Amino acid sequence: MLKEFREFAVKGNVIDLAVGVIIGGAFGKIVTSLVNDLIMPLVGIIIGGHDFSGLSIKIGSAQILYGSFIQTVIDFLIISFSIFIFIRYLNKLKRKKVEEEEVVETPDQTEVLLTEIRDLLKHQSQSKDVQ
């Protein structure tokens, strides 16, 4: 059972997935910092000096932090757009690879003539053997 697990864990897809999850987690932290520390303060200045993280509505004893929600939505949009651009780039590379594989080499005129001469000589040789 340990051997089977080792074979499973060493497969390229599992390792790629693990690396992707780790990098994705780190990327998420970078985007969160970008939104919280750079984008939202600039947006706050543009719309009148508001700090979005502190925006809230108090209803009874409940406090609804909609500013934090706005920041989370912006995080999501930036991460989604970044992933979209990355996947689009990967798909473009895959299409280019497929197109390169589909290109069929057409023999040049010299090759065609040499092939015809070879076939004619082979045919003549077989005709002489039959006689």
From Swiss-Prot:
Chief localisation class: membrane
Transmembrane segments: 14-34, 67-87
UniProt keyword terms in alphabetical order: Cell membrane, Ion channel, Ion transport, Membrane, Transmembrane, Transmembrane helix, Transport
Membrane topology: Multi-pass membrane protein
Gene3D superfamilies linked to this entry: Large-conductance mechanosensitive channel, MscL, domain 1
UniProt subcellular location: Cell membrane
GO MF entry, a single one: mechanosensitive monoatomic ion channel activity
Gene Ontology, cellular component aspect: plasma membrane
Record flagged with keyword Metal-binding: no
HAMAP family according to UniProt: MscL
Family: Belongs to the MscL family.
Function: Channel that opens in response to stretch forces in the membrane lipid bilayer. May participate in the regulation of osmotic pressure changes within the cell.
Assembly information from the UniProt record: Homopentamer.
Name of the molecule in the record: Large-conductance mechanosensitive channel
The species this protein was found in: Bacillus pumilus (strain SAFR-032)
Taxon lineage: Bacteria, Bacillati, Bacillota, Bacilli, Bacillales
